Protein backbone atom coordinates (compact mmCIF):
# COMPACT_ATOMS: atom_id res chain seq x y z
CA UNK A 1 0.00 0.00 0.00
CA UNK A 2 1.36 3.42 -1.01
CA UNK A 3 2.07 5.74 1.90
CA UNK A 4 -0.09 8.84 1.97
CA UNK A 5 1.41 12.30 2.17
CA UNK A 6 -0.68 14.48 4.46
CA UNK A 7 -0.46 18.13 5.45
CA UNK A 8 -1.97 19.26 8.75
CA UNK A 9 -2.45 22.95 9.47
CA UNK A 10 -2.26 23.68 13.20
CA UNK A 11 -0.66 21.73 16.03
CA UNK A 12 -2.87 22.36 19.03
CA UNK A 13 -4.30 19.30 20.81
CA UNK A 14 -6.51 18.39 17.82
CA UNK A 15 -3.85 18.80 15.14
CA UNK A 16 -1.18 17.10 17.24
CA UNK A 17 -3.33 14.05 18.00
CA UNK A 18 -4.35 13.84 14.35
CA UNK A 19 -0.70 13.92 13.28
CA UNK A 20 0.28 11.19 15.74
CA UNK A 21 -2.62 8.98 14.69
CA UNK A 22 -1.82 9.28 10.98
CA UNK A 23 1.88 8.73 11.66
CA UNK A 24 0.98 5.51 13.47
CA UNK A 25 -0.50 4.36 10.13
CA UNK A 26 2.89 5.07 8.49
CA UNK A 27 1.60 8.18 6.74
CA UNK A 28 4.10 10.93 5.98
CA UNK A 29 2.86 13.99 7.85
CA UNK A 30 3.84 17.62 7.38
CA UNK A 31 2.69 19.67 10.37
CA UNK A 32 2.42 23.42 9.83
CA UNK A 33 2.56 25.55 12.98
CA UNK A 34 3.80 29.17 13.04
CA UNK A 35 3.87 29.36 16.85
CA UNK A 36 6.91 28.52 18.96
CA UNK A 37 6.62 25.55 21.30
CA UNK A 38 6.62 27.85 24.34
CA UNK A 39 3.59 29.64 22.91
CA UNK A 40 1.77 26.36 22.34
CA UNK A 41 2.33 25.56 26.02
CA UNK A 42 1.22 28.93 27.34
CA UNK A 43 -2.56 28.50 27.70
CA UNK A 44 -3.74 28.42 31.30
CA UNK A 45 -6.59 25.92 31.12
CA UNK A 46 -7.44 22.31 31.87
CA UNK A 47 -9.14 19.51 29.94
CA UNK A 48 -11.45 16.79 31.15
CA UNK A 49 -10.52 13.29 29.95
CA UNK A 50 -13.30 10.72 29.62
CA UNK A 51 -12.97 6.95 29.52
CA UNK A 52 -13.39 7.06 25.74
CA UNK A 53 -10.50 9.53 25.49
CA UNK A 54 -8.41 7.29 27.75
CA UNK A 55 -8.87 4.35 25.38
CA UNK A 56 -7.84 6.53 22.43
CA UNK A 57 -4.70 7.65 24.26
CA UNK A 58 -3.95 4.00 25.06
CA UNK A 59 -4.09 3.13 21.35
CA UNK A 60 -1.65 5.96 20.64
CA UNK A 61 0.70 4.71 23.37
CA UNK A 62 0.35 8.00 25.26
CA UNK A 63 -1.84 7.07 28.19
CA UNK A 64 0.90 6.02 30.60
CA UNK A 65 2.52 9.46 30.31
CA UNK A 66 -0.78 11.34 30.39
CA UNK A 67 -2.04 9.44 33.43
CA UNK A 68 1.05 10.50 35.39
CA UNK A 69 0.27 14.18 34.75
CA UNK A 70 -3.54 13.99 35.01
CA UNK A 71 -5.60 14.21 38.19
CA UNK A 72 -8.28 11.56 38.49
CA UNK A 73 -11.72 12.18 39.97
CA UNK A 74 -13.89 9.41 41.37
CA UNK A 75 -17.26 11.17 41.56
CA UNK A 76 -19.18 13.70 39.47
CA UNK A 77 -21.90 15.81 41.04
CA UNK A 78 -24.50 16.92 38.48
CA UNK A 79 -26.89 19.62 39.67
CA UNK A 80 -29.81 21.23 37.84
CA UNK A 81 -30.83 24.42 39.60
CA UNK A 82 -33.84 24.90 37.32
CA UNK A 83 -35.58 21.77 38.61
CA UNK A 84 -33.78 21.65 41.99
CA UNK A 85 -32.44 18.17 41.36
CA UNK A 86 -29.03 16.54 41.62
CA UNK A 87 -27.29 13.21 41.18
CA UNK A 88 -23.82 11.88 41.98
CA UNK A 89 -22.16 9.63 39.39
CA UNK A 90 -19.47 7.23 40.63
CA UNK A 91 -16.92 4.97 38.96
CA UNK A 92 -19.11 1.91 39.54
CA UNK A 93 -21.71 3.54 37.26
CA UNK A 94 -19.37 3.15 34.28
CA UNK A 95 -20.06 0.63 31.53
CA UNK A 96 -18.55 -2.84 31.85
CA UNK A 97 -15.86 -1.97 29.31
CA UNK A 98 -14.46 0.39 31.96
CA UNK A 99 -15.12 -1.74 35.06
CA UNK A 100 -11.39 -1.98 35.86
CA UNK A 101 -11.12 1.77 36.35
CA UNK A 102 -11.08 3.41 39.77
CA UNK A 103 -11.48 6.92 38.34
CA UNK A 104 -14.58 8.26 36.65
CA UNK A 105 -12.45 10.62 34.60
CA UNK A 106 -9.38 12.85 34.74
CA UNK A 107 -8.36 16.47 34.38
CA UNK A 108 -5.06 17.51 32.84
CA UNK A 109 -3.46 20.91 32.52
CA UNK A 110 -3.03 22.19 28.95
CA UNK A 111 0.70 22.66 29.45
CA UNK A 112 1.20 19.08 30.61
CA UNK A 113 -0.85 17.61 27.76
CA UNK A 114 0.84 19.68 25.07
CA UNK A 115 4.32 18.88 26.43
CA UNK A 116 3.57 15.16 26.05
CA UNK A 117 2.18 15.63 22.53
CA UNK A 118 5.06 17.86 21.40
CA UNK A 119 7.66 15.40 22.70
CA UNK A 120 5.89 12.53 20.91
CA UNK A 121 5.77 14.50 17.65
CA UNK A 122 9.42 15.56 17.88
CA UNK A 123 10.43 11.92 18.29
CA UNK A 124 8.29 10.60 15.43
CA UNK A 125 10.15 9.95 12.18
CA UNK A 126 6.99 10.21 10.09
CA UNK A 127 6.21 13.78 11.21
CA UNK A 128 8.07 16.87 10.02
CA UNK A 129 7.26 20.34 11.33
CA UNK A 130 7.37 23.64 9.46
CA UNK A 131 6.53 27.16 10.58
CA UNK A 132 5.59 28.39 7.12
CA UNK A 133 3.19 26.70 4.71
CA UNK A 134 5.41 26.94 1.63
CA UNK A 135 5.02 23.40 0.23
CA UNK A 136 2.87 22.99 -2.88
CA UNK A 137 -0.54 21.57 -1.97
CA UNK A 138 -0.43 19.34 -5.06
CA UNK A 139 2.22 17.15 -3.42
CA UNK A 140 -0.25 15.96 -0.76
CA UNK A 141 -2.95 13.34 -0.88
CA UNK A 142 -4.89 15.09 1.89
CA UNK A 143 -4.77 18.51 3.54
CA UNK A 144 -6.43 18.81 6.94
CA UNK A 145 -7.06 22.00 8.88
CA UNK A 146 -6.98 22.17 12.67
CA UNK A 147 -6.27 25.88 12.90
CA UNK A 148 -8.86 27.03 15.38
CA UNK A 149 -12.39 28.32 15.73
CA UNK A 150 -11.85 31.18 13.26
CA UNK A 151 -10.03 28.87 10.86
CA UNK A 152 -8.14 30.80 8.14
CA UNK A 153 -8.17 27.60 6.08
CA UNK A 154 -11.96 27.42 6.16
CA UNK A 155 -12.14 31.00 4.91
CA UNK A 156 -9.50 30.37 2.25
CA UNK A 157 -11.31 27.27 0.99
CA UNK A 158 -14.70 29.04 1.23
CA UNK A 159 -16.22 26.22 3.24
CA UNK A 160 -19.74 27.19 4.39
CA UNK A 161 -20.59 26.78 8.05
CA UNK A 162 -23.37 27.65 10.45
CA UNK A 163 -22.94 29.77 13.55
CA UNK A 164 -25.47 30.54 16.24
CA UNK A 165 -25.03 33.20 18.89
CA UNK A 166 -26.33 32.25 22.33
CA UNK A 167 -25.71 35.65 23.93
CA UNK A 168 -23.28 33.94 26.29
CA UNK A 169 -19.61 34.09 27.08
CA UNK A 170 -17.32 31.85 29.06
CA UNK A 171 -14.87 32.73 31.80
CA UNK A 172 -12.21 30.07 32.38
CA UNK A 173 -9.85 30.31 35.34
CA UNK A 174 -8.27 28.35 38.17
CA UNK A 175 -9.26 28.75 41.82
CA UNK A 176 -8.49 27.10 45.14
CA UNK A 177 -11.61 25.61 46.76
CA UNK A 178 -11.35 24.26 50.28
CA UNK A 179 -13.86 22.01 52.01
CA UNK A 180 -15.11 20.22 48.88
CA UNK A 181 -15.01 16.40 48.79
CA UNK A 182 -11.72 15.16 47.38
CA UNK A 183 -11.54 13.99 43.77
CA UNK A 184 -15.04 15.24 42.90
CA UNK A 185 -15.97 17.16 39.74
CA UNK A 186 -19.08 19.31 39.40
CA UNK A 187 -21.43 20.13 36.54
CA UNK A 188 -24.03 22.73 37.50
CA UNK A 189 -26.83 23.72 35.14
CA UNK A 190 -28.05 27.25 35.85
CA UNK A 191 -30.54 29.57 34.18
CA UNK A 192 -27.66 31.84 33.14
CA UNK A 193 -25.62 28.97 31.69
CA UNK A 194 -23.63 25.90 32.82
CA UNK A 195 -20.84 25.97 35.39
CA UNK A 196 -18.17 23.26 35.56
CA UNK A 197 -15.62 22.71 38.33
CA UNK A 198 -12.84 20.30 37.41
CA UNK A 199 -10.46 19.19 40.18
CA UNK A 200 -6.72 19.57 39.79
CA UNK A 201 -3.97 19.02 42.35
CA UNK A 202 -3.67 20.77 45.72
CA UNK A 203 -7.35 21.81 46.02
CA UNK A 204 -7.10 23.73 42.74
CA UNK A 205 -10.06 23.63 40.34
CA UNK A 206 -10.42 24.59 36.71
CA UNK A 207 -13.57 26.72 36.60
CA UNK A 208 -15.54 26.97 33.35
CA UNK A 209 -18.31 29.52 33.86
CA UNK A 210 -20.89 30.39 31.20
CA UNK A 211 -23.20 33.36 31.61
CA UNK A 212 -24.84 36.15 29.63
CA UNK A 213 -22.55 38.66 27.94
CA UNK A 214 -23.62 41.43 30.33
CA UNK A 215 -23.18 39.30 33.48
CA UNK A 216 -19.80 38.08 32.28
CA UNK A 217 -18.61 41.61 31.61
CA UNK A 218 -19.80 42.77 35.03
CA UNK A 219 -17.91 39.89 36.66
CA UNK A 220 -14.72 40.72 34.79
CA UNK A 221 -15.04 44.36 35.86
CA UNK A 222 -15.21 43.51 39.56
CA UNK A 223 -12.49 45.00 41.73
CA UNK A 224 -9.92 42.73 43.38
CA UNK A 225 -10.97 44.33 46.65
Segments (PLM) and residue ranges:
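Beta1/beta-strand and adjacent pyrophosphate-binding region of the FAD-binding site
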Residues: 1-12
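Glycine-rich FAD pyrophosphate-binding loop
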Residues: 9, 21-45
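Short beta-strand/turn micro-motifs composed of small residues
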Residues: 10, 33, 80, 175, ...
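N-terminal Rossmann-fold NAD(P) dinucleotide-binding loop
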Residues: 15-16
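Rossmann-fold NAD(P)-dependent oxidoreductase module
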Residues: 21, 120, 174
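N-terminal glycine-rich dinucleotide-binding loop that anchors FAD/FMN and/or NAD(P) in oxidoreductases
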Residues: 45-68
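Conserved N-terminal helical subregion
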Residues: 55-59, 69-156, 162-169
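Conserved FAD-binding catalytic core of PHBH/FMO-like flavoproteins
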Residues: 146-225
